A protein has these predicted regions:
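A cross-kingdom feature that marks ATP-driven nucleic-acid transaction machinery
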Residues: 107, 113-284
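Interdomain hinge/linker elements that couple catalytic modules in large macromolecular machines
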Residues: 1-182, 196, 202
């Protein structure tokens, strides 16, 4: 009941905060881009042009690196929007290299992360405190460090299309794979808060598919009681939480809190899962 009253009283504030969050999602945080947005009275044309200049600089920087892995870096960089728009969102090495050797791409991911172009997210095959001990580097997600840049990168071949749909997305009149953008910006915010990114998938042999898919796992709790916290990211107001519920049953003794990050207001479910609006991710 307390949560219900809080939700009712803060509805106008939540609506305003979500609008500002969507602005940030589309514009990003690059100083020149933000300046263009403010100076042009919150129009998007020059915003997109500034972002494309930054993306061009990234590509030029890649062309200057050691040729031994320059092509690998480019192949990952160019396909980031495609990987993130897929269901699993992870990099599929076999689509880049028929030998399917993930280890051959380790320097590639390191360069992209070290250059602050991307944020890495590794699979944990047995999530517990000390996530790096169960890290599986054969499975990786590669997020853009700036979600505004990801939006423009996704429309590299159709810049005029991108310019025409900014306002439509901002006003919720058009949906362009918001799941990709939401998950990317949550990754961006978690990294900014100091978290190293991990995810978890469980493959069901009988069903021949994943039956648990957790977007992010972070370390949480105080110094005397450190545990893990699973996070599911939802870009729409209607969703299911089967994966998170199964994960909680499987690893309940290891879990501090479980979170759903969604477009709706703050609430706590009867099963203890904490649902937070996307703009509150920095609190985790």
């Amino acid at each position: 009941q307390t949560v219900s009253r809080a939700d009712h009283g803060t509805k106008p504030l939540h609506k305003k905060a979500m609008f500002l969050f969507k602005q940030y999602l589309l514009v990003g945080g690059m100083p020149k881009v933000v300046s263009a947005y403010i100076e042009d009275n919150k129009q998007f044309e020059n915003v997109d042009e500034e972002k494309r200049e930054i993306l061009k600089t990234y590509r030029n920087d890649i062309m200057k690196i050691d040729q031994n892995y320059q092509s690998k870096v480019l192949s990952i960089y160019d396909r980031i929007p495609g990987f993130l728009s897929s269901h699993e969102k992870r990099v599929k090495i076999n689509s880049l290299d028929t030998t399917n050797r993930a280890i051959a791409y380790e320097e590639t991911f390191f360069w992209l992360a070290d250059s602050m172009i991307c944020n890495e997210c590794f699979s944990s095959n047995d999530p517990n405190v000390g996530l790096s001990l169960t890290e599986d580097r054969t499975y990786i997600k590669c997020y853009m460090s700036d979600t505004g840049l990801l939006f423009s990168h996704a429309f590299d071949e159709y810049p005029e299309v991108a310019k025409s749909i900014y306002s439509s997305i901002l006003q919720d009149k058009l949906s362009v794979n918001k799941g990709m953008l939401y998950e990317n910006i949550i990754a961006q915010m978690l990294v900014a808060s100091g978290h190293k990114l991990y995810f978890y998938n469980h493959y069901n042999e009988d069903k021949h598919r994943n039956d648990i898919e957790i977007d992010f796992i972070i370390i949480s709790g105080d110094k005397t009681n450190v545990k893990i916290s699973p996070i599911e990211v939802k870009s729409s107001k209607k969703y299911t939480t089967t994966s998170l519920e199964k994960f909680n049953l499987t690893f309940k003794k290891r879990i501090s809190n479980s979170y759903i990050i969604h477009p709706k207001n703050l609430s706590i479910r009867d099963d203890g899962i904490i649902c937070i609006p996307a703009y509150m991710t920095f609190c985790l």
